[in-house]
């Protein structure tokens, strides 16, 4: 409600909440910091896990920042921005989601201290933007070039990514799988490599142990052979991929045919059989002994395929058909009549196997496959899910290095280097922006401090030791949470792609700047029916944070 010449002017509908100026900033900063605080304890190899239970009683146990925030039903708009930080980090770099969110939260905490000193938000925003830009330059300077063919480097990065997750005991084994999978699907484009992660399929089955997880250089499909009379194992497979149904098509037009004699009915049935037989004969004629069909297969067609000793699988997903094409070299054919021997793919073995009591089709021994499958095993559903998340992160990290060819030391080392260098840079800039750049530098120390805290170490003492050692020995010194001492992270093999800290700082600073720009929050009241039966809503999103 506003007032004009003493008269109240109603602009917004009844029930609308409004927060202006410092109230709006305080509310948004607090909401964002609560999100950062939620995931902070999961950071690093000694981080804890979160158990999330939804309204249906489904349970997720994880320490993956992006998964935690994705599973939470977050209402506050500023808090939702922090969720976007994690999602962007996950999409662009694959790892460092918790790091990005924690840095964003700390940047806002430091900004609040400056706001309390009456520093204008515009000055803080300018200082943060300068610091973020300088941080990108510094990271490029300290990044080490590596040979993307060096499997040992790739494996160390994958191990670093997996450490601290549920699959930690088998991290060496899982890291090998991640490296091999990425190397297999990487394609050289000019002087660099490109990796399309859509070509790596993750298939999960409960049962066995994590050690039973395996990489199949080919494709695993959660389907079974359509007819009991078909072979369950085909060596030297010639594979046809068909994305039409092996059935008699119904006409587009609605037509009725009057049958006046049994002979006419018999003629119809014989013609139907002839059409199906021609389809199957064509498959046999081109030399295919395995056929994957995206749609259905008629019972009669199944019978003839079985009679000819051809293995057939129906209703295969489009994404699986594309992976089969990349793995075997086959071409997906729309019309069976157009099938030629050149359209067939090859695999040493196609076999139906029982995995955890269910039938699955394994297509293995493909020549230089550009699609692979990681079959994930584990004792419980929660273990299998967490192993999948760990492997997805590891695969993305290896992909980053293969594409960029640059790494940095992990374990808080880059953040400490940035903090030291940004402090020096702040003095060059001068003015009130200097205060914001110094605050940015101080905020980055939250990463080594949190790593130490989560490992049960004294955060202040550890940070002082690490900064002193870092200044003396160079930018690769970080926090060894296992020994509780400063250590050369590069020598210890604790490394990450440079893309991870670069994206984390970029996402965190952009989110902090966006939240600092807001000086007015207007929240409409929810509809009555939503209030009665729904979740807690946006009409009172500030109440829990006041």
From Swiss-Prot:
Gene Ontology molecular function terms on file: ATP binding; ATP hydrolysis activity; ATP-dependent protein folding chaperone; unfolded protein binding
Key words, A-Z: ATP-binding, Chaperone, Nucleotide-binding
Lineage per the UniProt record: Archaea, Methanobacteriati, Methanobacteriota, Thermococci, Thermococcales
Quaternary data: Forms a Heterooligomeric complex of two stacked eight-membered rings.
N-terminal signal peptide: none
Top-level lineage group: Archaea
Protein function: Molecular chaperone; binds unfolded polypeptides in vitro, and has a weak ATPase activity.
UniProt GO BP: protein folding
Name of the coding gene: thsB
Pfam families in alphabetical order: Cpn60_TCP1
InterPro entries, alphabetized: Chaperone_TCP-1, Chaperonin_TCP-1_CS, Cpn60/GroEL/TCP-1, GroEL-like_apical_dom_sf, GROEL-like_equatorial_sf, TCP-1-like_intermed_sf, TCP-1_chaperonin, thermosome_alpha
Protein name listed in UniProt: Thermosome subunit beta
Protein family according to the UniProt entry: Belongs to the TCP-1 chaperonin family.
Protein source organism: Thermococcus kodakarensis (strain ATCC BAA-918 / JCM 12380 / KOD1)
């Amino acid at each position: 409600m506003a007032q004009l010449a003493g008269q109240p002017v109603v602009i917004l509908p009844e029930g609308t909440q409004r927060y202006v100026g410092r109230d709006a900033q305080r509310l948004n900063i607090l909401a964002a910091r609560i999100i950062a605080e939620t995931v902070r304890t999961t950071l690093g190899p000694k981080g804890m896990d979160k158990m999330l239970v939804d309204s249906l009683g489904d349970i997720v146990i994880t320490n993956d920042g992006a998964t935690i925030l994705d599973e939470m039903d977050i209402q506050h708009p500023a808090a939702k921005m922090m969720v976007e930080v994690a999602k962007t980090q996950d999409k662009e770099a694959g790892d460092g989601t918790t790091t990005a969110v924690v840095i964003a939260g700390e940047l806002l905490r430091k900004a609040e201290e400056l706001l309390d000193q009456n520093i204008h938000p515009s000055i803080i925003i300018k200082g943060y933007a300068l610091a973020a830009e300088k941080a990108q330059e510094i990271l490029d300077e300290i990044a080490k070039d590596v040979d993307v063919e060096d499997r040992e480097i790739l494996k160390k990065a994958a191990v670093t990514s997996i450490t601290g997750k549920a699959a930690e005991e088998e991290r060496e084994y899982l890291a090998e799988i991640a490296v091999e999978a990425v190397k297999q699907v990487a394609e050289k484009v000019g002087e660099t490599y490109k990796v399309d992660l859509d070509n790596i399929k993750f298939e999960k089955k409960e049962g066995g142990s994590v050690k039973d997880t395996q990489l199949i250089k080919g494709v695993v499909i959660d389907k079974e052979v359509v007819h009991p009379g078909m072979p369950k194992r085909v060596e030297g497979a010639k594979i046809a991929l068909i994305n039409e149904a092996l059935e008699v098509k119904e006409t587009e037009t609605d037509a009725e045919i009057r049958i006046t004699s049994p002979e006419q009915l018999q003629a119809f049935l014989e013609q139907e059989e002839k059409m199906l037989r021609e389809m199957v004969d064509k498959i046999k004629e081109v030399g295919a002994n395995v056929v994957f069909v995206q749609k259905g297969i008629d019972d009669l067609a199944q019978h003839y395929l079985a009679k000819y000793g051809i293995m057939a699988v129906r209703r295969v997903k489009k994404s699986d058909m594309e992976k089969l094409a990349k793995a075997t070299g086959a071409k997906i054919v729309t019309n069976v009549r157009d099938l030629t021997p050149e359209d067939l793919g090859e695999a040493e073995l196609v076999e139906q196997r029982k995995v955890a009591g269910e039938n699955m089709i394994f297509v293995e021994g493909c020549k230089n496959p550009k699609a692979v499958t990681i079959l994930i095993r584990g004792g419980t559903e929660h273990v299998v899910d967490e192993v999948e998340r760990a492997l997805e992160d590891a695969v993305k990290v290896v992909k980053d290095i293969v594409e960029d060819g640059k790494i940095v030391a992990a374990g808080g080392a880059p953040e400490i280097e940035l903090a030291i260098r940004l402090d020096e840079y702040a003095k060059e800039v001068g003015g009130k922006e200097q205060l914001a750049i110094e605050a940015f530098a101080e905020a980055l120390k939250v990463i080594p401090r949190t790593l130490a805290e989560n490992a049960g170490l004294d955060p202040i003492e550890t940070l002082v030791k690490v900064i002193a050692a870092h200044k003396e020995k160079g930018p690769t010194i970080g926090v060894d949470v296992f020994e509780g001492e400063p250590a050369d992270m590069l020598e210890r093999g604790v490394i990450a792609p440079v893309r991870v800290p670069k994206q984390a700082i970029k996402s965190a600073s952009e989110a902090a700047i966006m939240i600092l720009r807001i000086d007015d929050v207007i929240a409409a009241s929810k509809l009555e029916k939503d209030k009665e039966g729904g979740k807690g809503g946006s009409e009172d999103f500030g109440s829990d944070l006041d």
